[in-house]
C-alpha cells in the first residue's frame, strides 16, 4: 500500500480514538447537538479504523513469517502462514480502498421518493402501487419512517403518482440507485385472453436538504394555487381549501400537497419537495456532463433510464444496468431489496476506484 494512503489511514485511526474519548466527556454529553454529530462521525470512522487495525496486524504477521523462513524446521509452516497473510493483506487493502472512496454528502440524508405511473394505463397505476408497497416494506425492515406527502390514486387502485418522505439512517445512500424506469410484464386481472402486458413506472429519489442548503427560490417565481383536498382527513377535508399546488415558473416544476389539514403545513411540505426537485434537476444536469465521459449508474428518474424489468410469469427481476437477473420476484416485491441494491452499490464503487486509478 502506498505510504500516502497509510498516512491518511493513520490520521483517520487517530481521529477515531480522539472522537471516542470526546464521546465519554461530560461537556460533550451535555451538548446534545455536538454529541449527535460526534456519534455520526464515530460511526463513519469505525469501519475504516477496524479494518486498518486488522491490516496492521497482518503486516506484523507477514514480518514474523518472513523471519521464520530462515529456520529450516519452520520453513514449510512459515511459507503457508506467509501465503495466507499476503492473501488477507490484499483483501484488507481492497476493503480499505473502498472505505476511503469519497462519500456522497447526501448519502446519510432522508429522501423523497416519487413513484409515477407511465405507459400502461390502469395496469401502470397498479404497478406503481406495488412498487410503493415494496419500498415501504423495505423501509419498515430497516426501521425507517415513511410519510406520504401527496398521492393521486388510480381509478382501479394503485397510484397515478405518489410522493413520500422516508426518514432514517442512510436512506438516500441506499435508495438513490432506484431512480429511473421500472418495467413490469404480467397478465392484468382484466385480461381474459391471458396475454402478457408490458407497463412502466418511473421512480425518482431525491435527498431531503437542510434549510441552509435549499436552492434560493424567488417568491415571484412561484404560482401558488389552493384547492379542496380529496382523501383522508375526515369531514374537514372537503370544507376548506387546505390543499396546495405550487408551480415554479422558470422550470415548470409542479408540486402538490394535500396530506395535512392545515394549508400552512401543506405549503411547507410542498416547498421542501420543490426545493429537492430543483436541486435534483441541477444535479441531473451535472451528472449528464459526467455521463458523457463515464458510465453513470445514477438514474435521473426519467422514463428513458431503464433500470429494471419485473417479469411476473417467470418470477424474474432483471437489472439492466449491471446485467443482473434473479429468480425471486416474490421476495423482491415483499421488500427484500438488498439483493438488488448491494450489487449496484458495489458496481458504483468499482467505477469510482477505476476513475481514481485513471487520475493517478
UniProtKB/Swiss-Prot annotation:
Principal localisation: cytoplasm
Homology family: Belongs to the prokaryotic/mitochondrial release factor family.
The record's account of how the chain is modified after translation: Methylated by PrmC. Methylation increases the termination efficiency of RF1.
SUPFAM superfamilies to which the protein is assigned, alphabetical: Release factor
Gene Ontology MF terms: translation release factor activity, codon specific
GO cellular component: cytoplasm
Name of this protein: Peptide chain release factor 1
Keyword Cytoplasm: yes
Pfam families: PCRF, RF-1
Transmembrane segments: none
Keyword annotations from UniProtKB, A to Z: Cytoplasm, Methylation, Protein biosynthesis
Modified residues (N5-methylglutamine): 235
Family matches, as PANTHER family: LD18447P (PTHR43804:SF7)
InterPro entries on file: PCRF (IPR005139), Pep_chain_release_fac_I (IPR000352), Pep_chain_release_fac_I_sf (IPR045853), Prokaryotic/Mito_RF (IPR050057), RF-1 (IPR004373)
Role summary: Peptide chain release factor 1 directs the termination of translation in response to the peptide chain termination codons UAG and UAA.
Sequence segments annotated as region (Disordered): 284-312
Subcellular location: Cytoplasm
NCBIfam families reported in the protein's UniProt record: prfA, PRK00591.1
SMART domains: PCRF
